[in-house]
Amino acid sequence: METTKNRRVRFTGGLHEPAQDSTMCGNAELQSRERTKTRQRVYNESKRDLVDLLRVYTCLNSVRMFTFVNFGRRIPLAWPEGYQLVINNCRDENEYADEKLDELAGLVCCPERLVVLGYVKKRGGIGSEPCYWFSKGDIVVLLGGAGRVYAHTWLLPQQLCRVGDTIDDFLRKGLKRFYYAHQLVSSLQFVVEDPEVDGVRSCRDVLCFRDRHIGRSFALRWPKNETLLFHRRRDSFAFVMCDEARRRLAEMCFFGSFGYKYFGDEGRISLYVADDGQIFGFNDNDEDGRPRFVAEDFQQFRRIGVTQYYKSYVFRREQPEWALLPTCHLSRMFYQKTWRQADADVLFLIARNDERNKFPDAGTRSAVHDVVR
């Protein structure tokens, strides 16, 4: 093994990669600490500005009064950086009248009441007041029962994203769960130096892109320590019990894989592109033996990566084939996930008890199920 003053090569399980020097590691650690401090500062500011809302958020009529009294107030978001939530009930906008809110609530798998909290705008400079006026393409933040937070835009009218399981969750994460927010700020899950990457959409485009970058590996922003590799491979489909799934997989085209950066080829999740450009993930070692929906097209894949292979927060009027469904807010899994909020929030505990009185099976339902129309 060769070593030099500033660079050494480390071998692990037959794979080798450059080891980062101490300077690079130190800079990355410093930047990570700064980002953590910034997120904590924004979280503290947001909680301070929304203290009145946190006293009444379990009563949606009181929330409407809060938006009326605090009309135009701006609350910083943890993500995207530099964006704010403008408090506004949007009562003057026909798109968010009560009947429209009922239609949006109908996208959720179980009963949910929604009220508009405000819309999202980029922070402007002095004298830029008009930039805070509402426009139809803005992201609108809605509040549901027990502080569940949703995001919607009329550019994607048939989709509703749960961006926060609780208000505290929303204040810490911002709009990270919402695909359109990643598109809005051009946030990418992996970076490829290719002048033609913005035009990659069809199945043929993806395969040409793969051939240009075959054998190259790119770090994913999430999950941490996972990489995306463009290459060729043929899966066995040995565990695919569904004839339809096996047939569809055979019709798709393999273009790469993702997984933990030290894993060999056999331990990675395969990526397939369909004729219409949709992207699916497939684990050849999975006993379930079914593909999972990952992205509508390659451009969406660049922005949200493989998130939808692992979990989903988006309720759609028509779910893509083999897409994961969001966790039901009345399920046992969701109740267990959010229960720690009750330790610090008596209002949340009261709202959860009221919800159980209204829906006796709340907290016992299955994690995912289809929308009951």
From Swiss-Prot:
Source taxon at top rank: Viruses
Which Pfam families does the UniProt record give? US22
**InterPro entries (UniProt xref):** US22-like
Query: What is the similarity comment for this entry?
Result: Belongs to the herpesviridae US22 family.
Q: Report what the protein is called.
A: Protein U3
Protein species of origin = Human herpesvirus 6A (strain Uganda-1102) (HHV-6 variant A)
Lineage of the species this protein comes from? Viruses, Duplodnaviria, Heunggongvirae, Peploviricota, Herviviricetes
